[in-house]
Amino acid sequence: MRRRQIALVMAAAMAASALSGCGGSGNSGSAATAAPATTAAAASEAPEAGGESAGETEGADGEAASGDKEGYLSTFDVAGAGDVSLDVMITSLGDSDGGPFLRGVMDKYMEMYPNVTLTPVECSMNDLYTTLITQATAGTLPDIFTMSEAYSANCLEMGMMVDNLPELLGEDYMNGLLDVAIENSTVDGTFVFMPWQNNTSAMVYRKDLFEEKGIEIPKNWDEFLEAAKTLTEDLDGDGKVDRYGSAFAGTRNDSAESRFQTFALTFGCDFITPNGDGTFTSGFGTDAYKNAMTTFVRLATEEGITPPGFVETGYSEAYTMIAADEACMFFSASNVLGGIYNANPEMKGKMGSFPMPTAEGVSPVTSFSSVGMTISNTCENPEVAADFLKYLTSVENSVAWNEATCRLPVVKDALTAICENDEVYNGFVEASDSAVIYPPFAGLAELRDICGECWQTVVSEGVAVEDAIANAAAKAEETAKTYSN
C-alpha cells in the first residue's frame, strides 16, 4: 500500500487561528504542517493540474467565459453552446437527504442556462460497478457518472472517461482541491475522476453518554470493547438490552466490505501491495488479516455489544439504530451523521467523532477515500459537463451539501468553513493526520467481496472462522495473480 501521512490541507489554511474550533484533541498542530509524502516516482506520475491551457475553454468571442457572477469558476461559454442535454448519474440522487439537494442544484443550473437540460439518473453505490460495466459494454454510459478509487483502475482500463479532465476543470479549480484527493483520483498518472466527497473514516459516538458515564475515548479495540460494554444497557429493567454499545455493518455489499477494509488497516493489514513490477501480493494470508477478521466477527456477534442481526445490518440499519437510541458507536465517513440527524433531529448536539481504535502495537491509522464524478468519453458536450460539475462543487454548494448530508467536501475553502462551524467533525480532522490511501487495483471490489463472503459463511453457515479465512486467503491470492501483469 502507498501509505500517506495525510493532513487535510484545510488544517494548514486554518492553522493560524481556526484550529481551536475544528482540530482534534491536541494533535491539530502537527496536522497544520504535515503534507502528503510523495516519492519521486509518484510525483512524476501525478497529472499536471490544468495543463498548458489552464483549463480555460474559449467562448465564441475568443475569450474565456467568466463565471464569477455565478459564484463558481466557470471558464466556458455555456449560454453560447446551443441546446445541450446531459444524463447525470450520481449515486446520491437516490438518497433521502442528498437526492433532493442534487435535484435542486440541477434545477438552479438549468435556470441559469435554459439551453441546458440535465436528466437525473439513479443508481445505488452498491450497484454502480456492475451498472457501469454493462453500460460501457453497450455504449450507453451517461454523460456524467459517479466514480471512486474502488473502480477507477477499471474505469481507466476500459476507457470509460475523457482523457483531459484536468484541462476541462481548469487550473484554478484543481488548485482548490485537497492534494490527497487529487492523488486518490489518479491512476498511473491519469486523473480519472473529479473528487467530491472527503470520506476519511472515523468512529461516530454518543458524546453525551460518554460524558455522562465518564468514558474515555478508546485508543485500541480492547478499550473500545470495554466502552461498548459500559454503554450496553437494559434501560427499563425488563431483562432485555435496550441500548447496545455499538453497531457493525455485516451485509455483503461494498458499503460494509469497504468498512472492513478500514477495520483491517487498524490491525496493520493491507489488502493488496504492489510489488513494483506490475504484480501484486495479497495480505489475506497474514496474521494481521486473520486477527482482523477474527476480531471483527467476535465484536460483531459474540460480545453482546451489538444488536442482533449482524449479517442483515447495513449502513442505513446501523445509523437508524443510533438515531433510535439503540446503539452508540459506528465507524464510517462523516455522512453517517446526516443519516442519524435525518432519522432523529434530536441527536444534533449529542454526537461526536474520534479516530479509529487500533490493535495493540499498531500506530493510529485510517483510510481516506473519495467518491466523485467523471465525464464519459461518449459525452458530446464535455465542456458543459465540466462546467456543471464545477458549479455543483462550488464553495457555496459544498457547504450547503454538508448541511444537507453531513458529508465533508474536498474543496479546501468549503472544508475550512464547515469545520470552523461544527466540532462534531473533530475526530475526522484528527484521523486525517494518519490516513492512508489505497493503491489503484482493478480487483479491489473482488477482494472486498471475498471478505463479505468470509464473515457471512462464519455467521450464517457455521463455518469455522479459521477455515473461512483460509478460503478467503486462497481466493485473494488468485485475484492478485489475475490482475498482475
Cite the ranges covered by each PLM segment.
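Extracytoplasmic/periplasmic substrate-recognition and gating elements
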Residues: 107, 111-112, 117, 212-213, ...
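Glycine-centered hinge/linker elements that transmit conformational signals in sensory
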Residues: 228, 278-310
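Extracytoplasmic "Venus flytrap"/periplasmic binding protein-like
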Residues: 104-177, 208-219, 320-321, 326-329, ...
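Hinge/lid segment of periplasmic solute-binding proteins
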Residues: 48-80, 124, 148-201, 216, ...
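Extracytoplasmic "Venus flytrap"
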Residues: 72-80, 86-103, 254, 438-442
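Long, aromatic- and glycine/proline-rich binding clefts that accommodate carbohydrate-like moieties
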Residues: 180-184, 351-355, 402-453, 457
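Conserved C-terminal helix/tail region of periplasmic/extracytoplasmic solute-binding proteins
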Residues: 50, 54-66, 211, 301-304, ...
